[in-house]
From Swiss-Prot:
The keyword Transcription regulation does not apply. This is Large ribosomal subunit protein P2. InterPro entries: P1/P2_N_sf, Ribosomal_P1/P2, Ribosomal_P2. Signal peptide: none annotated. Belongs to the eukaryotic ribosomal protein P1/P2 family. GO terms for molecular function: structural constituent of ribosome. Residues 76-91 have a biased composition (Low complexity). One of its GO terms (cellular component) is cytosolic large ribosomal subunit. Residues 76-114 are annotated as: Disordered. GO terms for biological process: cytoplasmic translational elongation. P1 and P2 exist as dimers at the large ribosomal subunit.
Amino acid sequence: MKYVAAYLMTVLGGNEAPTAADVSRVLEPVGAEVNPEVLKTLIDAMQGKAAHEVISAGLEKLQKVPCGGGAAAAAPAAAAAAGGGDSSSAAKETKKEEPEEEEEDGDMGLSLFD
C-alpha cells in the first residue's frame, strides 16, 4: 500500500509516469524500506495507464463484490419471531446449523491490472 500511496503522491506532484526511482525518493526520506521487486511490479503494472483510470476501474470492481450478509443473518431472526413464543427451540435450532466453509483468500476478481 505504501508503494501505491507514494506512486499517487508522485502523480499528484505532476509526474504522470513515475519511475521506480521517483517513487523511492518519496519513500526513503521517511525511513520506509523499499523492496525493488514490489516497486518494479507496481511500475510495470501502471505502465501506460493513468492513475485516475485505474482508480475508476477499481471502484467499478468493488461495486460488483457482494458484501451483504445482512439478509442471511436476518432470516433466522425473522423465522424465530414468526415461530411464536418458544424461543428456546429457536436457540437450539440455530446451534445445530453447520459452520460455513471458509473461502480461499484470493483477489476476488479485484485485480486492477487485468
